[in-house]
A protein has these predicted regions:
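Anion-binding alpha/beta catalytic cores of soluble intermediary-metabolism enzymes, centered on
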Residues: 1-330
């Protein structure tokens, strides 16, 4: 994971992006923001009450006047600008202007995503404090998904010198065949941004139809659907993870370009994805980067509950990197 992050960090040091850390009073978010600044990765902006942030800076052993930018909804001009932005977006879905003002004033995720949407910051990292689904709901009020993409979570696993991308680890409970296809196509876009040649395996507890169960039907349908798309990458499935990753299975399945070579694993459902990455982290000693929020129309990342400062820092770096390498306007 270090090589990937080193490459990203080298890149963002040059561009010095402005990154919002939404829960500026949270100890772990604050530590990550301070590390972001001290490592010269970019310019952190904290959302929080100034006196509370200063208190927290003292609590983590820094001078309360440590030079870091703090913003809050006391900034009247911004507040009016963000309320207007939100109201324009939501007036047709029954939101009143005063409700938009209330959201902008009281919700840091809303304020932070408005900062990015209005160009007052380049990227944002949020979370570590709230439930993931609630945060996504708030984000999607301000930010649309990318045209033709769905929003999902992608986690990078780095183990024994190999990097594997796992999707969807965070958002869609039971993806349909069509959603699995969208997740696969978006995952290859991301893998290429990180410099990988995508090789996609659709995972299951069965390999090429044995044993066939009701649980594997949508995965097989996804493969059939993939054949109707004009894609420029190799994919195959359904298959078990060992078949996807272990080269010694190549001779058993000589007809497949993916067996033993996969670097993108499309999971059949959220529970299997989530269990897999947590097991790998805890028991398999894999390094995790992410989950990255894919398909959102702005460079915003959500840190899961119990994220360490270094995990939050990685997400901040990736958000800054995304704001540089992804064209969000198109």
């Amino acid at each position: 994971s270090m090589n990937i992050m080193q490459g990203i960090n080298a890149q963002i040091k040059k561009s010095q992006k402005r990154v919002v850390f939404a829960e500026g009073e949270d100890t772990n978010i604050l530590k990550a923001a301070v590390a972001f600044k001290n490592s010269k990765l970019g310019i952190p902006i904290l959302i929080g009450k100034e006196e509370r942030v200063k208190e927290q800076l003292k609590n983590i052993g820094l001078d309360e006047n440590f030079n870091i930018e703090i913003v809050s909804s006391k900034n009247i001009r911004e507040r009016e600008k963000y309320t207007k932005h939100l109201y324009q977006k939501l007036q047709r879905s029954g939101m009143l202007e005063r409700e938009c003002d209330h959201l902008v004033r009281n919700d840091r995720v809303t304020w932070g995503s408005c900062m990015v949407a209005c160009g007052d910051a380049d990227a944002m990292v949020t979370g570590g404090t709230r439930h993931h689904a609630a945060t996504i709901e708030k984000l999607s009020r301000v930010v649309d998904s990318r045209p033709g993409e769905i929003i999902f979570g992608l986690t990078m696993l780095v183990s024994k010198g190999r990097t594997v991308f796992v999707s969807d680890t965070n958002v869609n409970d039971n993806p349909t065949a069509a959603q699995l296809v969208q997740i696969a196509i978006s995952s290859t876009r991301v893998a290429r941004l990180f410099g990988f040649d995508p090789k996609v395996a659709f995972l299951s507890h069965s390999t090429f139809g044995k044993p066939a169960t009701v649980r594997t039907k949508h995965v097989r349908e996804a493969i059939e659907l993939m054949k109707t798309k004009k894609v420029d990458f190799d994919y195959d499935g359904e298959m078990q993870p060992d078949v996807a990753l272990n080269p010694e299975y190549k001779e058993s399945y000589p007809f497949s370009k993916i067996v033993g070579n996969a670097n993108i694993l499309i999971m059949p459902a959220l529970h299997s994805a989530s269990i897999t990455v947590k097991l790998m982290k805890t028991f398999g000693g894999a390094k995790l980067i992410g989950p990255l929020l894919i398909g959102l129309g702005l460079p915003i990342e959500i840190a899961p509950l119990r994220s360490s400062p270094s995990e939050i820092l990685n997400l901040a770096s990736i958000a800054a990197y995304s704001s540089e390498v992804i064209d969000y306007k198109n």
